[in-house]
Regions:
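S-adenosylmethionine
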Residues: 1-405
Length: 405
């Protein structure tokens, strides 16, 4: 794998020879595979990860010994777990440290939904999450993942940051996982190497500042901005954090981490604020940068709930979840358990013949007790109501079920 020469020269100088060599060595290793369990569905349900090592900063996270065929696991489609890179689970650790009462949170650049599902599972009960994605196609993928995750207190929107600024909605916590040059993903996604350039780095840090500027107006006094990228360079990381602090008179907050997690701090000599950098070969993860920034309280207290009520949610493009598909653990109506071959057939959109004593009408079909979706039983057969855009498209079906959990 050939890394861009300009990237190598800059990053070696930034990290130092020893750290950079560990990073280079990581390319000869298999990238770790990790999942995060859904506490709404798994806790107390007897599901566990066989042979998986815990992700130390996320109690629901596990490293897997090898990468299974996730597509062919009905429990993935049921929202029992989410396949997520381990470093990205760090957002749950941040939220659990700083958020202890119900809040309204915005994930501004949320697709495909990993950090949103981690956030909604980590926030105190009674919280609300706005999960937003500007790109329409990616927003539909986000909607699918949020729906399957099964938390009712999540609103999916398809808007640009400037639309949120115009809405006058206010949030206690805003996650800005901003578009970036992707240097931290080089090992996992070789295509990102070909997309990298110094010019793209320049475009990214400027775009990131525009996004943060829009987000900042939506943040309540005393609220938290979680700024993250999946890149290494300081222009998109430390230098942007310093700009945020100077531009908005903000302060950086520390996050409790353990030495054995091998998370790296600031790489900018004249910048000592607490930031958290995950480097492949050092940390058991791909690349990530995280910083927690607090908007200083105003001399005049702001009332968040009044701000939410006074905002213009109607001006946002909200995407409605499919009301026929409930992924909540507590549900009403008849249910039919499916075998593994039946579950795969259902997820492929095929019609099924249900047991003779199945009531006519809408029926929830489940796998190992977890709902996959709905069918309409008309007696001679059951019509498949699983959304077409969610269906498994591969024709290969394994002979036996290889469970992840």
């Amino acid at each position: 794998m050939q890394l861009p020469e300009e990237f190598v020269n800059y990053t070696r100088k930034l990290m130092g020879n020893e750290l950079f060599q560990h990073y280079l060595d990581s390319f000869s290793e298999e990238a770790p595979v990790s999942i995060r369990l859904n506490p709404l569905k798994v806790e107390g349900g007897g599901l566990k990860v066989e042979g998986g090592d815990p992700v130390p900063w996320c109690p629901e996270g596990y490293y897997l010994p090898k990468r299974p065929n996730f597509t062919m696991d009905p429990l993935l489609h049921a929202g029992c777990y989410y396949v997520q890179e381990a470093a990205s689970m760090f957002v749950s650790h941040v939220l659990r440290q700083y958020v202890h009462t119900p809040v309204v949170m915005l994930d501004l650049c949320a697709a495909p939904g990993g950090k949103s599902t981690a956030a909604i599972a980590s926030l105190p009960q009674g919280s609300t999450l706005y999960s937003n994605e500007p790109n329409r196609n990616r927003a539909n993928i986000l909607l699918e993942n949020i729906t399957k995750w099964g938390y009712p207190n999540c609103i999916v929107t398809n808007n640009y940051p400037k639309d949120y600024r115009a809405s006058k909605l206010r949030f206690d916590v805003i996650l800005c996982d901003v578009p970036c040059s992707g240097e931290g993903m080089f090992r996992r996604d070789e295509a990102t190497i070909g997309e990298w350039s110094k010019q793209n780095v320049e475009r990214c840090w400027q775009l990131q500042r525009d996004i943060v500027s829009d987000a900042w107006t939506c943040l309540c006094d005393g609220g938290l901005l979680i700024y993250s990228t999946c890149t290494f360079n300081t222009k998109e990381n430390e230098e942007n954090v310093r700009w945020i602090c100077e531009e908005f008179d903000a302060e950086v907050l520390p996050v409790d981490v353990r030495p054995e997690w091998n998370i790296t701090g600031s790489l900018l000599p004249d910048f000592s604020a607490p930031v958290y950098r995950f480097i492949p070969g050092i940390t058991r993860s791909e690349g990530l940068f995280v910083c927690v920034i607090r908007k200083k309280p105003s001399p005049t207290p702001s009332l968040l709930r009044e701000g939410i009520k006074g905002g213009k949610r109607s001006c946002l493009k909200e995407i409605q979840m499919n009301q026929q598909h409930s992924y909540l653990p507590h549900r009403e109506g008849p249910e039919v358990g499916l075998s593994y071959p039946q579950a795969i057939a259902y997820l492929r959109g095929e019609a099924l013949t249900l047991p003779a004593d199945t009531p006519r009408g809408i029926v929830t079909v489940t796998f190992q007790g977890h709902p996959l979706g709905m069918m309409k039983n008309i007696g001679t057969r059951a019509n498949n109501l699983y959304p077409k855009e969610w269906r498994i498209r591969t024709t290969h079906v394994p002979h036996e079920y290889q469970s992840v959990l």
